């Protein structure tokens, strides 16, 4: 069903059960899923969050300037991308980290054509550093990169199997949506992504699939056209 996707992973997901730091079991499990999908023919670019290390907005009111705090958060995404890339390489798949601002020799400066070349030869492109600007979330960065590389869909990997009427971890009566339009998600105040990311995806006709990244085989199922998670579309 999909040939090329942008996979968005939260920083907390890389931090394991505690959501802090880097959890090698989580990194290894995600790398195996990503590598299996890549070997099956899916072209995958990845944008990681940085909340397991630092999030700029959390520093406001604690002595951190928002602009500098966001810069620290962007650096956290680079650390996460470098860590995940190593585990992907261990699975026999090329993994190249790109950054939104120049950081050679740590990683390559992001150029759309260079990232696409990695995808076309079967590798994984990890695009770090958000948009390179403060006040933009990594969700917005993921939406931007998905549009730039011509992805068929933006996949948001979470720890729940889709979008619900309420938080299923807190409300046992919450009901899962199989499909939603952007307008429905906004009107129902379902926080799938922030408004800027929504606007980018809506304007660019970029579908979003919210799914459980911790369930083995979900990425490969998407390639086969199987229904996984919740589809949010224009």
Name each region found by the language model:
Residues 1-234:
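C-terminal catalytic "cap/lid" subdomain
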